Amino acid sequence: MAAKDVRFSEDARHRMMHGVNVLADAVRVTLGPRGRNVVLEKSFGAPTITKDGVSVAKEIELKDRFENMGAQMVKEVASQTSDVAGDGTTTATVLAQSILREGMKAVAAGMNPMDLKRGVDKAVVAAVEELKKLSKPCEDSKAIGQVGTISANAEESVGKIIAEAMDKVGKEGVITVEEGSGLDNELEVVEGMQFDRGYLSPYFITDQQSMAADLDDPYILIHDKKISNIRDLLPVLESVAKAGKPLLVISEDVEGEALATLVVNTIRGIVKVCAVKAPGFGDRRKAMLEDIAVLTGGTVISEEVGLSLDKVTLDDLGRAKKITVNKENTTIVDGAGSADDIKARVEQVRIQIEEATSDYDKEKLQERVAKLAGGVAVIKVGAATEMEMKEKKARVEDALHATRAAVEEGVVPGGGVALIRALLGIKDLKGANHDQDVGINIARRAMEEPLRQIVNNSGEEASVIVNQIKGGEGNYGYNAATGEFGDMIAMGILDPTKVSRTALQNAASVAGLMITTEAMIAEAPKDEEASPGGAPGMGGGMGGMGGMGDMGMM
C-alpha cells in the first residue's frame, strides 16, 4: 500500500480552501448577463471559449492533492445542481465559496464548527421556505421562453424554440436536442407514437419517393415472439384481406417463409402488409408492446396470457388512422385506443417514474409517457463550426433542463433578487447559542453574494446596488444587462425556483462538510520518496553495495 500524507485541522482546511478559491474564482467570473469568458485549452484543435460555469469547473484539476480535494468537492456542488435543476451551477459555486470562506474565519476564531454548520442549515431551511412563498407558477409560453433565454446566456432564439417545442408536445412531452446540419436552430415535431424500428424488407415500400411504407387505416398485429411459420399467420391474413385493409405486423422478428409470403402478398396486391421488429429489449420490449396495444386498442398476442397466433381474430388487432414506416422508424398516428385506457396507462408509467432510482430508467419511462400522450419534439442545433456546435448544444440542453424545472416548481425573480428576498425568512431567526447565530449570519451574507458577483461582472459598484435592492420589495431588482432598476419579472428576468433552491441547499451541504473537516488524507507525492543526491534510485543501491562490502571485510 502506498504511503499516505495526512494533514490536520487548520493546515488541512487552509489547503482545501485554497483549492476551492482557485476553482470558484475561475467559475464566478461567468455569472450574469455581463459574465466574462473563460478560455479552455484542448489537447488537440483550437481552444474552447465558454461562459458555462459547469464546463469551466469540469476542466479544473490541481497539482496539490489536498487543494484538489477542495476543488473537487465544490465541483460536485456544481454538477449536482446541474443534474437536478439544469442550471444554477455558478450560483451554487459562489454560495459554497462564500459560506466556506466565512465559516473558516469563524472556526479559526475558535468557534465550534458543528454549531456553525447547524446555524447555516437552519438558515437554509428557513430561506427555502421563503423561496417557495415567492414562487409563481410558470405556465404561459412567454414565461417559459424567458427562462430558456436566461439559462442559455441571454440567447433569445433558444428560449423561443424551447417554448415552441413545449407548446407542440405539452410540458411533459419528450424534447430531445440533436446536432443539426444548418446554421440555424430548427424544431422538428413527430406526432403520434414513434419507435426506432424500420421495415424488415424494402419490398414493403409503397411510396418510392420518400422510401416509406404508408398504411392508411390499417390493422395492427402485436406479437411478442418470432414468426417463421406462415401457417400461424394465414387466418389473420385472410381476415384482413376480406376486410380490405392494410396490416402492420409488429413482432420479435419475421423470417423465412413467413416474411417471403408477406412480401409476395404485398407485391401481388392481395393484401398490403408491412412487418417491423418490436422496439426495445427484454422487459422494456414487453412494456412497449403493451403501450402500443393500449394506444391502438389491440391486444398483445402472447402465450403468457394464453393467446396463440392461429386463434387471432380481427377484434384482437389494433387500429390506427395512419402508419408510416421508413428504413429506421415506425410512426403510429391517431391510434384507436380508448382515451380512458391511455390515461390510465400514462398514470401507471408516471408512478414507475417516481419509483425509478436511475436517471436512465427515468428518461426511458418519460419517453414512454410522451409517446403515449402524443408527441416528441427534436431541437436541431445549428452552428457554423463544430466547436460552436458543441458549446451551443450544451447550452440548449441546460436551458431545456432549467425550463422543465421552472414548469415543475415555478419561477422567482432572477438576477440574484430571489435570494435577497428570501433573507426575510431568516431576519428574526435565532440559533440555540452564539455560534449557531454566527452560522445564520454566514448564510445571510452568502445569500447576497450571487447578486454582488453579477454586479461586479457588469463593472458596477456592488455594495451600492445591493443596498438599493434591499431597500425595495417584491420583484424590484437590477437588470445587469441594461443597467436599469425595476420589476425583474416584467423585464423577463426569471429563475426557476428549483434552481435557486437546489443551488442554496447543495452549497450549504458541501460547505458545511468542509467547515467540519478535521483531517485530510492523500497519497504522498512520489518525488519525495526518491533519496536526495545523484540519479534517482542510484544512491540507495550504491549504499547497499557498500554495506555488503563492509560485511565481507569483517
Curated annotation (Swiss-Prot):
Its EC number is 5.6.1.7. It comes from the Bacteria. It is found in: Cytoplasm. Keywords: ATP-binding, Chaperone, Cytoplasm, Isomerase, Nucleotide-binding. GO terms for cellular component: cytoplasm. One of its GO terms (molecular function) is unfolded protein binding. It catalyses: ATP + H2O + a folded polypeptide = ADP + phosphate + an unfolded polypeptide. ATP binds at residues 30-33, 51, 87-91, 415, 479-481, 495. PROSITE patterns: CHAPERONINS_CPN60 (PS00296). One of its GO terms (biological process) is protein refolding. Together with its co-chaperonin GroES, plays an essential role in assisting protein folding. The GroEL-GroES system forms a nano-cage that allows encapsulation of the non-native substrate proteins and provides a physical environment optimized to promote and accelerate protein folding. Belongs to the chaperonin (HSP60) family. Forms a cylinder of 14 subunits composed of two heptameric rings stacked back-to-back. Interacts with the co-chaperonin GroES. This is Chaperonin GroEL. It comes from Nitrosococcus oceani (strain ATCC 19707 / BCRC 17464 / JCM 30415 / NCIMB 11848 / C-107). The lineage of its organism: Bacteria, Pseudomonadati, Pseudomonadota, Gammaproteobacteria, Chromatiales.
